[in-house]
């Protein structure tokens, strides 16, 4: 319970869809994006370069690519809505940017869920020095 309280306090300063993304991660993947993916491999967390280290890191790479394709949207501050219907997440259609961001986040959460068996703790807190070289194109 104390851990949940700490996470809640940390999220107070986080704006926009980052909060929604964490909630989607918990609903779809059943684990915290902050705890497991905020600093994982070469692409999970801030920045990203080189080649994804495993399937979980590839989810982050694809998520970054999805965000990069958005025009006129800011995934860090734009908020979105979604609902659950018959166990499926349905992104709200009230805002075009919000819908696109939600779809990116939903795809990433599904990807993380599907790649849990490849998660390797050796890539948690992975040094950026290991991510040198040319980045893979989206």
Swiss-Prot record:
Q: Pyrrolidone carboxylic acid: which positions carry it?
A: 84, 125
Q: List the disulfide bonds.
A: 42-131, 44-60, 59-111, 65-138, 66-104, 73-97, 91-102, 131-138
Q: Can the keyword Transmembrane helix be found in this entry's annotation?
A: no
Q: Which family does it belong to?
A: Belongs to the phospholipase A2 family. Group II subfamily. D49 sub-subfamily.
Give the propeptide segment as residue ranges: 79-82, 119-124
User: Where does the record locate the signal sequence feature?
Assistant: 1-37
Q: Where is this site: Binds Asn-16 of CBb?
A: 45
Recite the lineage of the species.
Answer: Eukaryota, Metazoa, Chordata, Craniata, Vertebrata
Q: How does it assemble?
A: Heterodimer of one of the acidic (CA1, CA2, CA3 or CA4) and one of the basic (CBa1, CBa2, CBb, CBc or CBd) subunits; non-covalently linked. The acidic subunit is non-toxic, without enzymatic activity and comprises 3 peptides that are cross-linked by 5 disulfide bridges. The basic subunit is toxic, has phospholipase A2 activity and is composed of a single chain.
Concerning Pfam families, the annotation shows: Phospholip_A2_1
- The answer to whether UniProt assigns keyword Coiled coil to this entry is no
Q: What is its biological role?
A: CAalpha-CAbeta-CAgamma: The acidic subunit of crotoxin (CA) is a heterotrimer of three disulfide-linked chains generated by post-translational maturation of a PLA2-like precursor. CA has no PLA2 activity and is not neurotoxic by itself, but plays several important functions in the crotoxin complex by increasing the lethal potency of the uncomplexed CB subunit. It acts by physically occluding the hydrophobic interfacial binding surface (IBS) of CB. Heterodimer CA-CB: Crotoxin is a potent presynaptic neurotoxin that possesses phospholipase A2 (PLA2) activity and exerts a lethal action by blocking neuromuscular transmission. It consists of a non-covalent association of a basic and weakly toxic PLA2 subunit (CBa2, CBb, CBc, or CBd), with a small acidic, non-enzymatic and non-toxic subunit (CA1, CA2, CA3 or CA4).
- Coarsely, its chief localization is secreted
Q: In which tissues is it expressed?
A: Expressed by the venom gland.
Q: What else is known?
A: The crotoxin heterodimer is inhibited by the crotoxin inhibitor from Crotalus serum (CICS). CICS neutralizes the lethal potency of crotoxin and inhibits its PLA2 activity. CICS only binds tightly to the CB subunit and induces the dissociation of the heterodimer. Tested on the CA2-CBd heterodimer.
Query: Could you tell me one molecular function GO term of this UniProt entry?
Result: calcium ion binding
> Site: Binds Arg-14 of CBb. Where?
49
Q: Where is the site described as Binds Gly-31 of CBb found in this chain?
A: 93
Effect noted on mutating residue 136 to K: No change in analgesic activity
* GO biological process entries: arachidonate secretion; lipid catabolic process; negative regulation of T cell proliferation; phospholipid metabolic process
PROSITE patterns found in the cross-reference section: PA2_ASP, PA2_HIS
Q: Where is this site: Binds Trp-30 of CA2, important for stability (Asp-99)?
A: 105
Q: Name one GO cellular component term.
A: extracellular region
Q: What is this protein called?
A: Phospholipase A2 homolog crotoxin acid subunit CA
Entry keywords, A to Z: Disulfide bond, G-protein coupled receptor impairing toxin, Neurotoxin, Pharmaceutical, Presynaptic neurotoxin, Pyrrolidone carboxylic acid, Secreted, Signal, Toxin
